[in-house]
Amino acid sequence: SDGMTPTKRALELQPVIRDVLSKLESSIQPETDFNPATSSRTFRIMTSDYAESTLLLELLGRLADCAPNITLDLITPSDVTFHDVEQGKVDMAINRFDELPLSFHQKVIWYDNFACVMHRSHPLASHYDLETYLKAQHIWVSKTGFGVGVGIDPNEVQKLGWVDAELTKLGKQRDIRVFTRHYHAALQIAKRQSLIATLPSKAAKIFTDDPDIVLREPPFDIPPIALKMAWSALLHHDAGHIWLRRLIGDVAAEMQ
């Protein structure tokens, strides 16, 4: 789930912050003594359930091979702020961001399309179009982690996510019966109940080898989402940080 958005004041201060950090960044000299094979460094990464279930799962396998003593401290968006990332208290944020402070360095890790997940016995698996999709019951994975539990009207959920935003453009609305912020929960519910989960493809493909699960392309267009990593200018020239960013890029490329 996405939980970090800059405040209005933070956005107003972006030019000033960018100038200050730019000067600090230029004074930092690259480190030359980082050795991943022997380092016992801990990297703190703010990330979402989506990135944990896809990218970071593969990253852990690579770390076990090339940097066995490295530790990852994975933090949820609700546990940190942009200020923590900006100060270098958190090594990086990996998530889907609508907007980021200008003081951050950032890079797109990948773009991901969507897929619909359902049990193979679901009627939709054999007769699948927009009409039958809308008649089915759905699981909604919250973009922000907020749902009806905090007073949001279920009839207005189309304002909160990519899937429902596109349905709204078509003048349509789906029947959502479960709200969750966890992709694994959505996948398990889709497997055991007669509900449909429309998820980013890389998360949906966790169940590719499960004979009870069927994946379908959505019966309407949904723009791809961008998974990004963002980090402080204070860490931009850090040798260990540079190594981790490159490793993440390599892992992401292999997953394309």
Set out the residue ranges of the language-model regions.
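Alpha-helical "hinge/linker" immediately C-terminal to small N-terminal DNA-binding modules
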Residues: T5-F34, S40
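Short amphipathic alpha-helical coupling segments at ligand-binding clamshell hinges
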Residues: R9-V16, L55, L59, D129-Y133, ...
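Central regulatory/effector-binding core of bacterial HTH transcription factors
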Residues: S40-L100, T180
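Acidic, Gly/Pro-rich loop/turn segments at junctions of secondary structure
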Residues: C66, S78-A136, G145-F146
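Hydrophobic hinge/microswitch elements
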Residues: S78-T81, E86-V90, I152-I213
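Ligand-binding "clamshell"
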Residues: L100-N113, S194, F207-E217
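Secondary-structure junction motif
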Residues: L124-Y128, L134-L170, D238-A239, R245
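A late-sequence structural motif
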Residues: E131, V141, I213-Q256
